[in-house]
Amino acid sequence: MSAKPSVGFVNEASRQILAGGSAGLVEICLMHPLDVVKTRFQIQRCTTDPNSYKSLGDSFRMIFRTEGLFGFYKGILPPILAETPKRAVKFFTFEQYKKLLGYVSLSPALTFAVAGLGSGLTEAIVVNPFEVVKVGLQANRNRFTEQPSTMSYARHIIKKEGLGLGGLNKGFTATLGRHGVFNMVYFGFYFNVKNIIPVNKDPTLEFLRKFGIGLLSGTIASVINIPFDVAKSRIQGPQPVPGEIKYKTCFKTMATVYQEEGILALYKGLLPKIMRLGPGGAVMLLVYEYTYSWLQENW
């Protein structure tokens, strides 16, 4: 049987971008309600606040009762607009960094982790302005029909705070940390463990093998990177005192949260984050791999 002709860079890149974008779109549509709940937990500061959520179940009940079903989809437009290019960048840059690192004397295990770190830092640059808008909309507790539109809220931020690190790009260093650390662990764990556990000939068991490794990858990465996520939400969300900026930089915000609220405050929203990015991480990897394989065969 004759070998397939070599695939040009443009075709290969197009497949990676399309598969990555598809993975992001599917994941955000399935998992966004948990992202809303996670953000709400991260920006609440004390349990004595009458609006604070007592538990995961309580948050779902309160949001549904006071804001309706669409309350769970607040802020979904920015991630939908961002997820396709964001995940496309995530997977495309991971593959490209991995290829570049092939010229360096790194072990395969370390190559996956370093390529993941590079892809996360690149992804953060693309996504941060969308994250600022998303967090602001998710923090709004009015009914879905009463909150500002995505574009009007973005214009409000630009007009009031500008485009810089105090405005549409605030929380940039925290976003770099969040995405860099997550992708480093996520890709590093997934591909290293997948290479260790033997491939199963049964398609169903092989699917479950990949899903299980992806689930663990997303879960472990979430546990490790959540302090950056909490810092990002505090910086990008509403400040405790209107007109006074309390949370400014990533590590100073972490230190402030730790000093005032304790170490566990840096892990606020961990359960909904794991519930979202555990299975969501598995979904992304599987959608990417199966879509990429389909594109290789059909395009």
UniProtKB/Swiss-Prot annotation:
It is a multi-pass membrane protein. Coiled coil: none annotated. GO terms for molecular function: antiporter activity. One of its GO terms (biological process) is lipid transport. One of its GO terms (cellular component) is mitochondrial inner membrane. Gene3D superfamilies: Mitochondrial carrier domain. It catalyses: 2-oxoadipate(in) + 2-oxoglutarate(out) = 2-oxoadipate(out) + 2-oxoglutarate(in); hexanedioate(in) + 2-oxoglutarate(out) = hexanedioate(out) + 2-oxoglutarate(in); L-2-aminoadipate(in) + 2-oxoglutarate(out) = L-2-aminoadipate(out) + 2-oxoglutarate(in); glutarate(in) + 2-oxoglutarate(out) = glutarate(out) + 2-oxoglutarate(in). Solcar repeats lie at residues 11-100, 107-196, 205-294. Keywords: Antiport, Lipid transport, Membrane, Mitochondrion, Mitochondrion inner membrane, Repeat, Transmembrane, Transmembrane helix, Transport. It is found in: Mitochondrion inner membrane. InterPro entries: Mit_carrier, Mito_2-oxodicarb_carrier, Mitochondrial_sb/sol_carrier, Mt_carrier_dom_sf. The chain crosses the membrane at residues 17-37, 62-82, 100-120, 179-199, 211-231, 274-290. Transports dicarboxylates across the inner membranes of mitochondria by a counter-exchange mechanism. Can transport 2-oxoadipate (2-oxohexanedioate), 2-oxoglutarate, adipate (hexanedioate), glutarate, and to a lesser extent, pimelate (heptanedioate), 2-oxopimelate (2-oxoheptanedioate), 2-aminoadipate (2-aminohexanedioate), oxaloacetate, and citrate. Belongs to the mitochondrial carrier (TC 2.A.29) family. This is Mitochondrial 2-oxodicarboxylate carrier. It comes from Bos taurus. The gene is SLC25A21.
